[in-house]
Amino acid sequence: MWGGCIQFRISVPGAKIICFKGHHMSRMSIRGQGQVTGKRSCHLHPLLRCAKGLLLCRPAAGLRHLQNQQNEPSQDPHQCADSCPALHSDRNHLNKEAEAMEGQNPTCSRHESAYPIQSQVSKSKKQRNYVDGAAVDDLKNLWDRLQTLQQSLTEMPYAEGLKPLKNFTSFEELLSMGGDSLLNDLLDIQDSITQCCIRASKYLNKEGNCTSLNYYKQPFIAAVYGPTGCGKSQLLRNLMSAQLIVPTPETVFFITPQVDMIPPQEIAAWETQICEGNFLAGPENTVVPQSGSIMPRFIQMSYAQLTKDENYDVTSPNNIFANAASKGPIAIVMDECMEDLGGNRGIAKFFHAFPSKLLDRFPKCTGYSVIVVLHNMNPRRDQGGNIANLKIQAKVHMISPKVHPSQLNRFINIYTKGQPTAISLLLKDIFNYHRLNTNFDWIVYNTEPIDNCMHWMYLSPQEGLIPMYLNIQGKLYQALERIHRTLTDRQRWTRYYHSKKK
């Protein structure tokens, strides 16, 4: 079905399906309640395929410490008994804490002396650690991810400048030759990864996909970067129909250089998709609107109308945005306006000052979204500073892998300074892989994610919106460095031993 992109089998009537046809995404609502099973054909980067299974990780277990202890000495018969039976053996006394009568099994004083008569059990200085079954499973889970990461780092084209990391040849060799210190450190890293997955799972659905881009954070300012033909206009409609922006806007303002630039079929597509994004399937064959409006409004505007003085003043009765905000959430979408944005007229107020005034003045306006489409990540013409302000104020950057690699590399170098160099190179390899192997896919960078796993996300027609877990990849790389350091130290001490032996 739909060109072999997605094949669905509906087992019971009553489900909602979000599907893509090529680069087009639409939703089908089926009456009743039931399940949908799907078969997808996707071409994900190997590391992204591995990220889909991160939520299946188990809590990390520690090492079980068993010491070389002597046998417990037999109890001295002259010592007091552990428990002394009271006079009321059936415990029917009103005061359960009543002491026994004098001479009837007197209680013993439990105060420990500073100098006990019996010497403490001697302990061996060296302790042996035994890994229990749960810890072995956690280490095996970590080992599989380390193998995937190391293979991806080795095979990517950017690996020439990376230092090769030593590793054990097999998992069995790691268990037998790793040592207690290394295994403990690896289990700590696995436990940290597990905690990250648990925190992130609260914001994901059962398939491990993100349910929203902003998770009700306001205002929502987004920049979309991509060359002509990469599906930017379709992406904008899909964000509305897939309900990735919450709350759902009741009024969508579509800004273009001229109003007559929009063909009738595109207007119909906008009206259809923002309408279907406003409803969810309800009980008993009903649909439930997600906003206070049954039919969201779609208003076309030119860039000249946007920059009118009356639209900057929230108190003006002619402010079209204020009038719409008094009824509910609004969204402003700017498409094909990069040349106008580079002019002298500044519109930076729409990115920071205007939304705060609008949200404070109108309680019904619970959502304010601005999405700006740019063909170039670094345009030369920006006389009014609009594009520079947009990049600063934007909370979400949606980047097509089709963008020129030099611009992508510059963006990645700026926004991954806290990550290891290997992870930054890996992100560049992910962009390059999807530039060559996929179409209409997007990489999303969130400056203020609800969870650190969602700083970088991947938006695919087949897979939806999935987190890339770059923070977890950084922890995995830390584990690889820990193994490398252990093996390097052993080799150095081995050389030192042989040199002294001669």
Swiss-Prot record:
- Which InterPro entries would you find in this protein's record? Adeno_IVa2 (IPR003389), P-loop_NTPase (IPR027417)
**One Pfam family from the record:** Adeno_IVa2
Annotated segments matching region DNA-binding: 495-502
GO molecular function term, any single one: DNA binding
Output the GO biological process annotations, alphabetical, semicolon-separated.
Answer: DNA-templated transcription; nuclear capsid assembly; regulation of DNA-templated transcription; viral DNA genome packaging via site-specific sequence recognition; viral release from host cell; viral transcription
- Which cysteines in this chain are paired by disulphide bridges? none
Oligomer status and interactors: Homodimer. Part of a genome packaging complex composed of packaging proteins 1, 2 and 3; this complex specifically binds to the packaging sequence on the left end of viral genomic DNA and performs packaging of the viral genome. Interacts with protein 33K.
Q: How is this protein named in the record?
A: Packaging protein 1
Per the UniProt record, the source organism is Canine adenovirus serotype 1 (strain RI261)
As recorded in Swiss-Prot or TrEMBL, the protein's gene is named IVa2
